[in-house]
C-alpha cells in the first residue's frame, strides 16, 4: 500500500496548492456538495441523476416523476456536508454525539422518529452474510467506538478509513448507516487535511464486497486497498476539475465527442451510459456540457466487460 500512499500525498499537495486560490475553493465546495450527495445516495438506491441532485440542492427543484424522499435525501446530504465542513474548520470534537447529529440531518423530514436515535430492532444487510449486533448492544458499542475516535493516532488517514468500517459494522441506525459512515469518514479526512473520498455508484459492488470480506473473514486488505485507491482517484478528479478553470481548460478534460473518440466508441453510446448512470462527466462547462478525464477510459473498458 506504500505506493498508493505516496501517490495520495503527491496529489494532496497538488490539490492544496490549487486551493490557495479562493475561487478554486468555492468551485470545489460547490461541486463536492452535489457530487457527494449524488454518489452516496445512489449507492443506497436513490434514483436521482447527478443533474437532478444538483437542481434539488441548488434550486430546490423537484419533479413528481420521482419519490419526494429522493429529493429530501439530496438536500439533507448537502446540509450534512456543510455541517462536517464547518465542524472540520472549527476542529469540533468527533464523538458519539457528533455522529448522532450527522444522522439526524440525514433523516430529517424523512423519518424524524428515528433521526438521531439508535435502532431498537434487529436489522440485516440484504444479500450479505454479515451478522449485525443485537440492538441492545448498540449503545455500549457506540460508547466504545466514541472513546476510540477520541484517541489521538499518528496515521489519521487509516484511522478515518477504519472508523468508516467500524460504524458500518455496528450499524447503529434503522436507516442511513452507510451515508452517515461515509460522512464520518470524510469529516475525519477533512479535519486531517485530506480531501473527501468519493465512492462512485459504478464501484458499489466492489465497495460492499470489500466491506463484507473484512467483516466476515477478518481480511482488511481488500477494503483498505479499495478505499485508498478511491481517495487517490477522488484527488485526481478534484485536480482535473480545477484545471477546467485555468487559462487552457480543454487541455486536461475532454468534451463528450473527444472522449468517445479516445475510447473508440460512438458518442451515442457514451450518452446512453450516462443516462443509465454507468458513466458520469467529471465536470461541466458553464453551459452545462459534460467534460471527461482521460483516466475515465478505464471506466469505459470496465463497462464494456460487464
Predicted regions and their residues:
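FIC/Doc superfamily catalytic core
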Residues: 1-175, 179-306
Amino acid at each position: 500500500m506504500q505506493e498508493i500512499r505516496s501517490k495520495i500525498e503527491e496529489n494532496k499537495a497538488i490539490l492544496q496548492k490549487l486551493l490557495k486560490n479562493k475561487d478554486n475553493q468555492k468551485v470545489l465546495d460547490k461541486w463536492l456538495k452535489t457530487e457527494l450527495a449524488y454518489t452516496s445516495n445512489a449507492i443506497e438506491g436513490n434514483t436521482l441523476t447527478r443533474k437532478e441532485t444538483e437542481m434539488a440542492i441548488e434550486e430546490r427543484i423537484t419533479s413528481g416523476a420521482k419519490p419526494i424522499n429522493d429529493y429530501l435525501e439530496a438536500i439533507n446530504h448537502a446540509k450534512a456536508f456543510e455541517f462536517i465542513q464547518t465542524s472540520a474548520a472549527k476542529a469540533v470534537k468527533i464523538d458519539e454525539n457528533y455522529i448522532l447529529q450527522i444522522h439526524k440531518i440525514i433523516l430529517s423530514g424523512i423519518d424524524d422518529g428515528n433521526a438521531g436515535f439508535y435502532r431498537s430492532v434487529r436489522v440485516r444487510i440484504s444479500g450479505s452474510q454479515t451478522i449485525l449486533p443485537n440492538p441492545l448492544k448498540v449503545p455500549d458499542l457506540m460508547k466504545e467506538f466514541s472513546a476510540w475516535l477520541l484517541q489521538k493516532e499518528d496515521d489519521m488517514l487509516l484511522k478515518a478509513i477504519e472508523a468508516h468500517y467500524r460504524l458500518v459494522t455496528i450499524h447503529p441506525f434503522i436507516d442511513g448507516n452507510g451515508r452517515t459512515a461515509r460522512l464520518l469518514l470524510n469529516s475525519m479526512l477533512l479535519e486531517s487535511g485530506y480531501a473527501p473520498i468519493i465512492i462512485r455508484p459504478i464501484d458499489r459492488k466492489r465497495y460492499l464486497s470489500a466491506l463484507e470480506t473484512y467483516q466476515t473473514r477478518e481480511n482488511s486488505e481488500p477494503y483498505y486497498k479499495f478505499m485508498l485507491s478511491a481517495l487517490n482517484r477522488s484527488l485526481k478528479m478534484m485536480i482535473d476539475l480545477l484545471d477546467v478553470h485555468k487559462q487552457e481548460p480543454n487541455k486536461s478534460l475532454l468534451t463528450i465527442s473527444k472522449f468517445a473518440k479516445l475510447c473508440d466508441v460512438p458518442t451515442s453510446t457514451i450518452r446512453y451510459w450516462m443516462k443509465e448512470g454507468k458513466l458520469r462527466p467529471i465536470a461541466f462547462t458553464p453551459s452545462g456540457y459534460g467534460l471527461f478525464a482521460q483516466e475515465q477510459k478505464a471506466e469505459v473498458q470496465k463497462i464494456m466487460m460487464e
